[in-house]
Structure formats: C-alpha cells, structure tokens
Amino acid sequence: MLGLYLSSLFFAFFMAQVFATKYSITFTSDEYEEDETGQNEPGPLVFHLDKNSLPPALLNQMEFNPYLVLADLPEEPRAVDSQEHTDTVLASKSVIDFLLEDPLTIVEHKKFSQIESILHEIMEDSIQKKVGADEVFEEIPKPKIYAYEDILVTNMSIINNSEMPTSTATLTSTISYLSSTTSLALSTGVTSVEIFPTITPGNITTIGGYENSSSSLMPSMGILSFLFGLYLLLHP
C-alpha cells in the first residue's frame, strides 16, 4: 500500500507538471488489478512518454524512481546507483588484492606479452607523430659537476712580531699658535702610519672659562669697558 500511495502521489505531481507545460503522456493501471487471491500486489506504474516533450532533469528523476517504469525512455546515459557502485568497488578491490598477492602470475600470463606489445606500439606511434610534426624541444642544460680537492695549507715561514726590526723617528711640526712633537716606532716594511700628535698650548689665555689665543684681549676689553662707562655718564 505504501508503494501505491507513493506512486499515486508522484503521479499527481507529474500530472500537475503536465497540465502546466503540455506534456504528452499515457497512463495505464493494468498492473494494479487484483490477482486470483484477492490481494492487491503492488507493482510499478507504467508511463508512455513523448521523448521530445520532457526536460532531461525530469526524465532523470523519473528514471530512478523505484515505483515507475518508463516504457519508452529516451536513450540517455544511466547513472550507477549506490548498490551497484558498492558492488563494483568490492569486485575491483578483490581483483587488485588477488593480483598483488603474486605479481609473477601477471608477467607469466599469456595476455601480458600482448598488452606489452600494444603499449610499445602506442609509444612508438606517439614518438613518430612528434617527429613528423617537427616539434622543437628545448634541451635542458645538464648540470655542471665540479670536483673539489682538499689541500692542506702549511706556512713554513712564520715571523714573530717581537723579532721584526724596528726604527724610531721623531716628527716635529711647528704652527704659528700650536707646537706638537710626536715620537713613533716604525716596523720594517710598514707603508702607512697613523699619527696622533701631542699638542702643547702656546699663547693661550683663559678668560672666564673660555680659551682664546690672542694676547691683546685684556687691553681691548679694558678700553671698551672705559668707553662704555663714559657713554653712560655723558648720555642724559
């Protein structure tokens, strides 16, 4: 009864679609006639469809309905249901497991040499097609391999700094207001020397914490102070 109810429900929905889009169908209920025992044995509904009046999406839904039989369904690819998919996976897995148990049986099989020769022919044909098409392949440069040899370096002539001969020279520089004297020791073979002179102050006078090298600063300041005081006294 459940199957009949589902079939009737689907048929009602289908009829609504037909009235809406003008599909051409024929329905028969001969499959639901009571048998000799008086029991209503559920059976599928049979539809005769117009192949050009239904969209592919609706045909796909009707094809996989277990309570519908489409007598003249258009020739379309049929999808595999879940049970068929499970059976196929189990069968393929069992075959793979059987082959992996003893790989030598594959090589010794009489079909193996035939398959191998076919694969070789396919590879040769593909190579000939590439050569015939004059395809240019850029050759990848081969990596260069360098050989390295460990060489032990030994220094046979080591000179200590204490043994190097030295000479002492005194440099004296005289400037108008500075005098410096620097003594330095030069090692044999030295071409550059940094000189840090010792500066001796000359003619430097300290006034109020500031240094000035002029010896006539005090008289000048005295004269300026006297003139500034005289200006303050005479200015009204």
From Swiss-Prot:
<feature type="signal peptide">
    <location>
        <begin position="1"/>
        <end position="20"/>
    </location>
</feature>
<dbReference type="GO" id="GO:0098552">
    <property type="term" value="C:side of membrane"/>
</dbReference>
<keyword id="KW-0472">Membrane</keyword>
<dbReference type="GO" id="GO:0005576">
    <property type="term" value="C:extracellular region"/>
</dbReference>
<feature type="glycosylation site" description="N-linked (GlcNAc...) asparagine">
    <location>
        <position position="160"/>
    </location>
</feature>
<dbReference type="GO" id="GO:0000324">
    <property type="term" value="C:fungal-type vacuole"/>
</dbReference>
<feature type="propeptide" description="Removed in mature form">
    <location>
        <begin position="213"/>
        <end position="236"/>
    </location>
</feature>
<feature type="glycosylation site" description="N-linked (GlcNAc...) asparagine">
    <location>
        <position position="203"/>
    </location>
</feature>
<keyword id="KW-0336">GPI-anchor</keyword>
<dbReference type="GO" id="GO:0031160">
    <property type="term" value="C:spore wall"/>
</dbReference>
<feature type="glycosylation site" description="N-linked (GlcNAc...) asparagine">
    <location>
        <position position="212"/>
    </location>
</feature>
<feature type="lipid moiety-binding region" description="GPI-anchor amidated asparagine">
    <location>
        <position position="212"/>
    </location>
</feature>
<keyword id="KW-0732">Signal</keyword>
<keyword id="KW-0964">Secreted</keyword>
<feature type="glycosylation site" description="N-linked (GlcNAc...) asparagine">
    <location>
        <position position="155"/>
    </location>
</feature>
<keyword id="KW-0449">Lipoprotein</keyword>
<dbReference type="GO" id="GO:0009277">
    <property type="term" value="C:fungal-type cell wall"/>
</dbReference>
<keyword id="KW-0134">Cell wall</keyword>
<keyword id="KW-0325">Glycoprotein</keyword>
<protein>
    <recommendedName>
        <fullName>Sorulation-regulated protein 2</fullName>
    </recommendedName>
</protein>
